[in-house]
Amino acid sequence: MSRSIKKGPFVHAGLLKKIEEMNQNGDKKVIKTWSRSSTIFPQMIGHTIAVHDGRKHIPVYVTEDMVGHKLGEFVLTRTFKGHIKNEKTSKRK
């Protein structure tokens, strides 16, 4: 179910404030955030945002195609290591 149009998209207030300040000053520093549920706005295009995955911050460079999506969509929280091949069951006699 999508978010109500009446409410509008969610973005963390502190994150939006930092983005607007950097746009005014012309800075391009990496911004750390824990807000994975924030929607990507057009003002964020061209910035690098380090999104927390539960362990560390993963840098995400925001492009035009990402507008409207959430920050957490671009950072995986689980790492799949693969299934271990069992030597005994794979050999047939």
From Swiss-Prot:
NCBIfam families assigned: rpsS_bact
Keyword line: Ribonucleoprotein, Ribosomal protein, RNA-binding, rRNA-binding
One annotated GO molecular function: rRNA binding
Gene from which this protein is expressed: rpsS
Role summary: Protein S19 forms a complex with S13 that binds strongly to the 16S ribosomal RNA.
Protein name listed in UniProt: Small ribosomal subunit protein uS19
One Gene Ontology biological process: ribosomal small subunit assembly
InterPro entries referenced in this protein's UniProt entry, alphabetically: Ribosomal_uS19, Ribosomal_uS19_bac-type, Ribosomal_uS19_CS, Ribosomal_uS19_SF
Record has Ribonucleoprotein as a keyword: yes
Pfam families according to UniProt: Ribosomal_S19
Family: Belongs to the universal ribosomal protein uS19 family.
A single cellular component GO annotation: small ribosomal subunit
Annotated source species: Clostridium perfringens (strain 13 / Type A)
Superkingdom assignment: Bacteria
